[in-house]
């Protein structure tokens, strides 16, 4: 099986990490992958560093390389458009965001759409995509070493116009707890005791999964696909997007080390059982085979 991956992102966000993890996982399974991504993108540079076949993204290269591969996998909206314009190969499209579909014509020709959550699947269906064309493939993350820190960690930029960051800061002030901001989550999780993830639109939340994999209890917004990975009071805390509710959630974990430990252990187990990179790779391969059969 030969797969051409397309990603137009210029930053290394959750979606780009998933592309990189998918390609490295596919290589372990004997699947040949090639990436087309923007020339200056971190994803392209990281793929080359991992010795994965990768080239700058462009319409002509999509057209040329699509003919040499069995299937094209577009990982975002712009690359979806490029695939439709430049290729007649079987097409799989990942949909990671919770926004409504803006251009329905784009969503009529792919062999399968990979929704990152059941919530995103419902958004696709509302946009006119037939249910039988949608497969839910959850993000996968590596299992990190258990965190041993004391910090209350929050993302400095979660791509949500800073609304979530402002809310986290307000809640931490109410709870009289200092926040540590991070732009390098995987590295900084080593210092974390609590992870706060607040957003107003979320397809799933791969940053949350990464924290859970390190056994860090999470306080997260009750929104989008997040309730599919966090079971309130079972493996984390879901809260309404109000400073008071968030402050209460942080305070519960701060004031009850036993609760924090229980939720952190359950969170790590959840990732082990359902959200590893291997789970994501194998489920994606199943979809590839279905499309090509």
Describe the predicted segments one by one.
Residues 4, 145-163, 169-173:
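Conserved donor-binding/catalytic core segment of Leloir-type glycosyltransferases
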Residues 13-24, 160-174, 209:
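A conserved mid-protein helix/loop that constitutes part of the nucleotide-sugar donor-binding site
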Residues 36, 217-220:
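Short hydrophobic beta-strand element within catalytic cores of glycosyltransferases
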Residues 58, 74-80, 95-96:
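Short His-centered aromatic/hydrophobic patch
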Residues 66, 91-118, 122, 127:
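A conserved, positively charged/aromatic
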Residues 200:
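Aromatic "clamp/platform" in nucleotide-sugar-dependent glycosyltransferases that forms part
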Residues 232-233, 237-244, 252-257:
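Conserved acidic donor-binding segment of nucleotide-sugar-dependent glycosyltransferases
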Residues 252, 259-274, 283-286:
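A short, well-ordered alpha-helix in the C-terminal region of glycosyltransferases
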